[in-house]
A protein has these predicted regions:
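Aromatic-lined, polymer-binding surfaces characteristic
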Residues: 1-123, 127-132
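Carbohydrate-active enzyme catalytic cores, enriched for enzymes
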Residues: 76-220
Length: 220
């Protein structure tokens, strides 16, 4: 909290560490300084200092409210959106708190990520970005958030998008192969079940020939 970089993706690296520590602590009343589980979770979500901004302040600063685009190059943007999506899952799983409802720009930011794609479905590599394929983890997190909070429209939208970009996801072999093993799995991961009735979307539904993102001063 005392050190770090507050206004870009590094802020989220710090917030993730603080959040993981906070989740394993006892309640505030169990500590002489009053800094327990509630203190650190509240700090991540709502409080800012010179070197560490809250999730809400950072989102207000970095996301374009109209386009959902994060104000860095696609590589860093994907990392930031993925970190926010993982926070969504942590809040759902451990706190029964809908972070997407509290911060609607997150859903828009995830939905906008296909705009980074070239026709070969690799992301454009402007700035400090290496061309590669778009991560689909944040789509999974939006589906899990929708399932946890009864949001069928959101679930159907991101399920169709996920099936469009990753048609192999959903079969048993792929799911077993992609099981993550890390300390975060104690707080986040639950098996993903996709609605088989939702058909894959068409790529044309998620991209446009020209997309203007003024906060990165680029035509994507």
């Amino acid at each position: 909290i005392a050190n770090g970089v507050p206004h870009n993706n590094w802020n989220l690296l710090q917030a993730r560490f603080i959040m993981n520590v906070g989740l394993v602590l006892e309640d505030n009343k169990e500590y002489a300084d009053g800094k327990g589980r509630e203190y650190y979770i509240d700090y991540v979500m709502n409080r800012s200092s010179i070197r560490q901004w809250s999730l809400t302040r950072l989102a207000d600063y970095g996301f374009d409210i109209n386009t959902g685009i994060w104000a860095e190059c696609p590589g860093y943007s994907s990392v930031v959106i993925n970190d926010y999506a993982n926070f969504v899952n942590q809040f759902d799983t451990n706190l029964q708190y809908d972070l997407v409802k509290a911060m609607p720009v997150l859903s828009k930011a995830v939905a906008t990520t296909p705009q980074y794609l070239f026709p070969n479905r690799m992301i454009c590599g402007f700035g400090d970005t290496h061309p590669g394929y778009l991560s689909t983890n944040f789509f999974i997190r939006m589906i899990q958030n929708a399932q946890a909070n009864g949001k069928k429209e959101q679930e159907n939208y991101f399920t169709a998008l996920l099936k469009c970009l990753n048609p192999d996801l959903g079969n048993d072999k792929t799911e077993k192969k992609n099981v993550r093993v890390s300390v975060n799995s104690f707080f986040e991961d639950k098996p993903l079940t996709l609605n088989p009735k939702v058909q894959p979307g068409k790529i044309e539904d998620y991209v446009s020939p020209l997309f203007y993102a003024p906060n990165v001063s680029w035509l994507v």
